[in-house]
A protein has these predicted regions:
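A short N-terminal helical cap/helix-turn-helix that marks the beginning
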Residues: 2-10, 30-52, 75
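Short, contiguous pre-domain boundary segments
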Residues: 15-25
Length: 102
């Protein structure tokens, strides 16, 4: 599936005759995993596509691509695995408002 239509696996969109979005709803399966189904998939299909731009109070920008996020997501997953956290375990994360945690 190509990038322009991949998101349709997870959303319903309805547009009017002028191309203006009229309705939008989210759909996802019970086994939906944002890191795998979105970040890793986009990281695989278009690794250089911009996913996130962080701007600090001084106006400095930090850009992250889907490829960057996929690598960071895998690092986090491996860290959790190393701590003995398994699929299905419940965890709570308290994160600062910083791009490294988004």
């Amino acid at each position: 599936m190509d990038i322009p239509s991949y998101h349709l696996n997870f959303v319903n969109e309805e547009y009017d005759e002028n191309g203006i979005l009229k309705k939008f709803s989210i759909k996802y399966p019970d086994n939906f995993n944002f890191a795998y189904d979105i970040i890793d998939k986009y990281g695989e299909m278009e690794p250089d596509r911009r996913a996130l731009m962080w701007v600090d109070l001084q106006g400095n920008e930090k850009l992250l691509t889907y490829g960057d996020l996929s690598k960071l997501s895998n690092r986090a997953a491996n860290m959790f695995r190393g701590w003995g956290i398994k699929k299905g375990d419940k965890v709570m994360l308290v994160l600062k408002r910083n791009y490294q945690y988004w």
